[in-house]
Amino acid sequence: MTSPASSTRDRLLDAAIALFARQGYSSTSVADIQQACGLSPGSGALYKHFPSKKALLQEATRRHVEQMDAMRDEYDRTRPSDTTSALRQGAEQIWASIDNNSQLLRVMFREPEALDDMIDELWSAVAANAYQRTARALSAAKDAGVSRVEDPEATSTVLVAALAYLPIVQLLIRRTPGKLDADRFREAWLRLAEGVFTGVPPT
């Protein structure tokens, strides 16, 4: 059973990130966060759970990293054996991770200085969970004589960055590249990625 203290802490985290994403980290006060949680703006209740507004943002960042790690572990447990299905599942998980953490990502892109001392931790998690893992898989495909790519690390970086581009553009400006819907974009990406991994040109 969740304790009242844990419940309040989670409510503060959720309310704060929503406010940071909507009106900006620097424009959000502790009183704003408390009021959004239904607490008295002048009560100082936030300080019972976090020493500062910055500490709250740091905790939200750690929670994001933990969620990415959990999704990585889930992918490892359920990864299909065939390339096409594995790529599809990986793509869906990357998009889900961006969607689930869209509010924190808005803060990161619009006010990077707010996350300045946390960027390395956050980016290391992103790299480990997407770029590096894709590079290892593509290197293995090349070593097995299946993929024909010359530079697995650079190629995998381009693949992951291209995949993440659509949801990030949607997140920031509510538009999509080329005005494509998400399904068409994903299916085109999957055909390209499968061609890279299998050495068979996409149709």
At which residue positions do the language-model features occur?
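Helix-turn-helix
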Residues: L19-A55, E59
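Amphipathic alpha-helical packing segments from all-alpha helical-bundle domains
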Residues: A96-N100, V107, D117-A144, E153-T157, ...
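Short helix-capping/turn signature of helix-turn-helix
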Residues: F50, F109-L115
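C-terminal peripheral helix-coil segments that are non-catalytic and often amphipathic
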Residues: E92, A96, R136-S139, A162, ...
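Amphipathic alpha-helical linker/stalk segments
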Residues: Q58-G90, T134
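Helical hydrophobic small-molecule/effector-binding pocket
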Residues: R62, E66, S85-R110, V160-A164
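N-terminal intrinsically disordered/low-complexity leader segments
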Residues: M1-S7, E74-D76, P201-T203
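Short hydrophobic clusters on alpha-helical segments that form packing/core surfaces
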Residues: L12, A16-F20, I94
